């Protein structure tokens, strides 16, 4: 009975923990490899697009009682 408990613990607890650790590292490596292929002009394009979006929803900063934060256009 003790041997079966040790085998079950190993299979159900330790083995999944080891595989999850490997899976967690792979997306970061893939993401870094994908970004290395982009030239600097394209990288800055992503950033400027995000900055142009603004942080306020449309119509919020036009209200009379609104004190717009500095990010509102």
From Swiss-Prot:
Q: Which family does it belong to?
A: Belongs to the conotoxin M superfamily.
- Cystine pairs annotated here are 55-66, 56-71, 61-72
Q: Where in the cell is it found?
A: Secreted
- Modification 4-hydroxyproline, positions: 57-58, 68
Q: What is its main location?
A: secreted
Q: Which residues form the signal peptide?
A: 1-24
Q: Which InterPro entries match?
A: Conotoxin
Has the keyword Secreted been applied to this entry?
yes
**Domain remarks in the Swiss-Prot or TrEMBL record:** The cysteine framework is III (CC-C-C-CC). Classified in the M-4 branch, since 4 residues stand between the fourth and the fifth cysteine residues.
Q: What does this protein do?
A: Conotoxin with small effects on sodium (Nav), potassium (Kv) and calcium (Cav) currents. At high concentration (10 uM), it has no effects on the peak sodium currents, but induces a ~10 mV shift in a polarizing direction in the current-voltage relationship. At the same concentration, it increases 19% of the peak potassium currents but does not induce a shift in the current-voltage relationship. At the same concentration, it inhibits 31% of the peak calcium currents but does not induce a shift in the current-voltage relationship.
Annotated tissue distribution: Expressed by the venom duct.
Q: What is this protein called?
A: Conotoxin Vr3a
Kindly indicate whether the keyword Signal belongs to this entry: yes
Q: Name one GO cellular component term.
A: extracellular region
Q: Which GO terms describe its molecular function?
A: ion channel inhibitor activity; toxin activity
Q: Which residues form the propeptide?
A: 25-52
């Amino acid at each position: 009975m003790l041997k079966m408990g040790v085998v079950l613990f190993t299979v159900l607890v330790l083995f999944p923990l080891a595989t999850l650790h490997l899976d967690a590292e792979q997306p970061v490596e893939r993401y870094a490899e994908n970004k290395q292929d982009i030239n600097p002009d394209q990288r800055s394009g992503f950033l400027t697009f995000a900055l142009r979006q603004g942080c306020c929803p449309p119509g919020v900063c036009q209200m009379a009682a609104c004190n717009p934060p500095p990010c509102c256009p």
